[in-house]
Amino acid sequence: TFPVSQYEMMDAFEQIHTKSPGDVYWQVDEFYCFDYLAPHLDESMSIFEFNSLTEQLSKLDERQETALEGLLQMQVNKHMQENGGPITVQELMMLAHNVDHCHVLADVHSNEDLGKFYVENGFREDLDALPDSAYALLDYAKIGKQMRESEAGAFTPHGYVVRTEELQPLPDYEPQRDINYMIRLTLMNHENEQKT
């Protein structure tokens, strides 16, 4: 299971008799969570990059996991609009580092839910002057769709996600890398040492 420490990684390489991460074929056999990442994990990602990503993912709480799923959907939509190609590992890491730059509305799963949320919480000032009897006539789905499209939000199975600020670039992203042994150490119990 991942993430693993750098020394656990080196031990695994030693057990399969390789020192080069390029010689290692890897695949994810089972996702316990984050299964929506599967289409974005490809053979160009090194085992060290994958380990760095899983290390970041292991730090996320439930709200942040939902934020990541929403951010990924937004990034995929952006790529589709710009013909930007596949999502890179650096983008996945950047998204995982930016989960706190979002609002997550856990009980909002549709345009209608979103429209009701915005109207009932006073975010649509243009509708505040309406008499209470007019609220029953509002098309909440249309209002929600307009708001979602204007703020480029995304629905996930766990709620609605919208960015609250611009995404920040990664701070000097450098995945774990292979470190060759610098010292080989043999340990033994001093009491069992034979005296000559």
What is each stretch, according to the model?
Residues 142, 151, 159-165:
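Short, glycine-biased loop/turn motifs at secondary-structure junctions and
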